[in-house]
């Protein structure tokens, strides 16, 4: 039988102040890999498919409560909330959680909201170990080369846990033990409920310790065992910004490795950052300095980077995106983007289309094979198929109060430095001359031009800027011209 065959509940402790973060944001709301710390913990808990998940919140609960609700919506399952009004220790926090688990009988796993690397696989292994042999408590432990600062796991000859001894209370013999407490436990619900009622705060901190449940259970003749995690890095807690960065780097390392094993080439893993929700296809090439964030989807045979940041983007098969910042938009098959392109939300570039250097788009739909090659702003616009927008063109969409839409047809050719004063429509097959300001609709197949004829005022520089280098150059050129004439 596996963990999924047994009744379980998961309690996630997230009530602490997290003062070492030195932040106005509650500790578990800091993010790595595109998720908050508590989101990582809740996703791991949900991976067990337990009957109940309870999040215990307290400090900063006005921030944490809505965040938990959002994660519950993403998971499409209920996450119960327990409030710890005063942070009176881990035992007290679990007491608060038990109010939400009234009548539950089964296994209760207690984990923390600041262990973002902990996986559902490890929690499942803990649950399996707990139910394999009837046990009151199973401690998830880890072995460390340097266990300094951690509570040591003391076992008897049968391998049962007899004590968890904190560093300050440990003898030299016990300090030599490399197996330590991770702070994650599996409990028999009935035994936990009974032991919690017996907790005392007669300790240096004046708090109720969850670890005291182990002694109470053993005192009543119940077995306490341990399950050792295969990867201690999963159980690293985050208490300050340094540990946040370390956890983020380790999570990213794992995510990048998974992408490479899935068929992507990542040229420089050290400078490539990929959020956990990102999807990457096969035969993808990712160049240095690339960040793939949010729910970005990278199709097969896409090339990304270098120096590219994509957030909630969909890049379809065969496209190329170089030195680009893009948000909440879609790039079609075999399209090309960049370099130095800024794609704002609501952009759709069709298959085989192009957004070139120093192009910015926003709420723009650009059809199959259409190109915006250089130095252009396209906002609130629709461009048909196989059209070409000349360099340095601007879609003038804002009148100071409202945004307006521009529609460009298919097979349109516009000259450089064309201004489209929205709302305006350019029909299929139309052209515009360089420097044209289009204020009125252009019929299909028409050539739009604007502005008066060029007028040259002879001698203006010598008259208005006498003695300047420009005036001297002009006079010299005129003398040469007169001599040749």
From Swiss-Prot:
Predominant subcellular localization, coarse grouping: cytoplasm
Pathway: Nucleotide-sugar biosynthesis; UDP-N-acetyl-alpha-D-glucosamine biosynthesis; N-acetyl-alpha-D-glucosamine 1-phosphate from alpha-D-glucosamine 6-phosphate (route II): step 2/2; Nucleotide-sugar biosynthesis; UDP-N-acetyl-alpha-D-glucosamine biosynthesis; UDP-N-acetyl-alpha-D-glucosamine from N-acetyl-alpha-D-glucosamine 1-phosphate: step 1/1; Bacterial outer membrane biogenesis; LPS lipid A biosynthesis
Keywords: Acyltransferase, Cell shape, Cell wall biogenesis/degradation, Cytoplasm, Magnesium, Metal-binding, Multifunctional enzyme, Nucleotidyltransferase, Peptidoglycan synthesis, Repeat, Transferase
Subcellular location: Cytoplasm
EC number annotated for this UniProt entry: 2.7.7.23, 2.3.1.157
Feature: compositional bias, Low complexity: 469-478
Binding residues annotated for UDP-N-acetyl-alpha-D-glucosamine, in chain numbering: 13-16, 27, 84, 89-90, 151, 166, 181, 239, 344, 362, 377, 388
NCBIfam families in the record: glmU, PRK14352.1
Chain's role: Catalyzes the last two sequential reactions in the de novo biosynthetic pathway for UDP-N-acetylglucosamine (UDP-GlcNAc). The C-terminal domain catalyzes the transfer of acetyl group from acetyl coenzyme A to glucosamine-1-phosphate (GlcN-1-P) to produce N-acetylglucosamine-1-phosphate (GlcNAc-1-P), which is converted into UDP-GlcNAc by the transfer of uridine 5-monophosphate (from uridine 5-triphosphate), a reaction catalyzed by the N-terminal domain.
Protein name stated in the entry: Bifunctional protein GlmU
Source species: Corynebacterium glutamicum (strain R)
GN (gene name): glmU
């Amino acid at each position: 039988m596996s963990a999924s065959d047994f009744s379980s509940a998961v309690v996630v402790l997230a009530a602490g102040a997290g003062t070492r973060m030195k932040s106005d944001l509650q500790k578990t709301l800091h993010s790595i890999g595109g998720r908050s710390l508590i989101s990582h913990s809740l996703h791991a808990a949900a991976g067990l498919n337990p009957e109940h998940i309870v999040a215990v919140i307290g400090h900063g609960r006005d921030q944490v409560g809505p965040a938990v609700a959002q994660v519950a919506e993403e998971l499409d399952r209920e996450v119960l909330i327990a409030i710890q009004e005063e942070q009176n220790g881990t035992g007290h926090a679990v007491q608060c959680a038990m109010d939400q688990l009234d009548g539950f009988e089964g296994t209760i796993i207690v984990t923390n909201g600041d262990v973002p690397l902990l996986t559902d696989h490890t929690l499942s292994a803990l649950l399996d170990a707990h139910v394999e042999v009837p046990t009151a408590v199973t401690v998830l432990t880890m072995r460390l080369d340097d266990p300094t600062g951690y509570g040591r796991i003391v076992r008897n000859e049968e391998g049962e846990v007899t004590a968890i001894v904190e560093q300050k209370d440990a003898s030299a013999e016990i300090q030599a033990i490399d197996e330590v407490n991770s702070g994650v436990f599996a409990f028999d619900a009935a035994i936990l409920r009974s032991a919690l009622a017996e907790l005392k705060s007669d300790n240096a901190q004046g708090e109720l310790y969850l670890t005291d449940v182990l002694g109470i259970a053993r005192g009543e003749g119940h077995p306490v065992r341990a399950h050792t995690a295969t990867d201690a890095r999963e159980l690293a807690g985050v208490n300050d910004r340094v540990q946040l960065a370390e956890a983020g780097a380790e999570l990213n390392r794992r995510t990048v490795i998974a992408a490479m094993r899935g068929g992507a080439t990542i040229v420089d893993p050290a400078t490539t950052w990929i959020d956990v929700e990102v999807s990457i296809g096969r035969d993808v090439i990712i160049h240095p300095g690339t960040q793939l964030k949010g729910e970005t989807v990278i199709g097969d045979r896409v090339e990304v980077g270098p120096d590219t940041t994509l957030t909630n983007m969909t890049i379809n098969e065969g496209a190329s995106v170089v030195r680009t910042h893009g948000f909440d938009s879609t790039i079609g098959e075999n399209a090309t983007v960049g370099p130095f392109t800024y794609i704002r939300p609501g952009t759709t570039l069709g298959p085989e289309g192009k957004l070139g250097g120093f192009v910015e788009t926003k709420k723009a739909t650009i059809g199959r094979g259409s190109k915006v090659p250089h130095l252009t702003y396209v906002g609130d616009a629709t461009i048909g198929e196989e059209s070409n927008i000349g360099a340095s063109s601007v879609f003038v969409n804002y009148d100071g109060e409202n945004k307006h839409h521009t529609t460009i047809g298919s097979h349109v050719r516009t000259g450089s430095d064309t201004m489209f004063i929205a709302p305006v429509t350019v029909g299929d097959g139309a052209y515009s001359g360089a420097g044209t300001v289009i204020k009125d609709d252009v019929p299909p197949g028409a050539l739009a031009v604007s502005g008066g004829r060029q007028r040259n005022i002879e001698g203006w520089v010598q008259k208005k800027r006498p003695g300047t280098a420009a005036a001297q150059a002009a006079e010299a050129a005129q003398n040469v011209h007169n001599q040749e004439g």
